[in-house]
Amino acid sequence: MSAEGYYRRAAAQLHPDDIVLDIGANIGLSAIAFADTCPGVRVIAVEPAPLAFECLRRNMGAHVPNGIALETGVGVANGTAQFTWYPRASANYSRYADRKRDNESTTTFLQNCGLDQNAIALVTNDVHDGEQIDVKVTTVSALLADHAPTGEIGLVKIDVERAELDVVRGIAESDWARIRTVVAEVHDCGDRLAQFCALLRSHGLATEVRQDAFLRGTELYEVFACRPPTW
């Protein structure tokens, strides 16, 4: 988490005994950071890809004792879905993988980092060659019903590579009042960023948007949304 990033800001606002949902946890680095920043939070970390999940399970066991790792995707409804897994880019795989867009974003990011074209070509060669995997999908509200039926949700972190709207559309109306903060990476294609922020605002969360300097020129943005204090 960068010093100025929204993940760090969200972590700093956690309270002991908060529930944290880490949706798209990958190998668990964010989950570890949340637990380290605020000991006492209960982290529910969710990751659908089997190889990434095995790393997540081990990391949670070693570094997040007050947490649980679940092997599932999260979307608008319960069921199964086909994901495109990128063995060479395990942080970029998705239910809505788009090889052309993913290649463009990676190339732009590396250019912003100062790499020359030869280095970029070497790094990106076949990086988004994918394979199909079938995974179980649940919803935020189903996760809460099964694993955290009560308590305040201090943070919902979302990093799901173009499935951001699916995740928040899977939150039942009765659960929104429990959620204090949402932080998400959002891919702004098809007006997704505006729709995502509008949905959060419709449930009482004030939204902010930023784009990291290294991601300028890509479709990737960060969203920070929090419920205003009641005093």
Outline where the language-model segments fall:
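Phosphate/nucleotide-binding beta-alpha loop and adjacent structural elements of enzyme active sites
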Residues: M1-W231
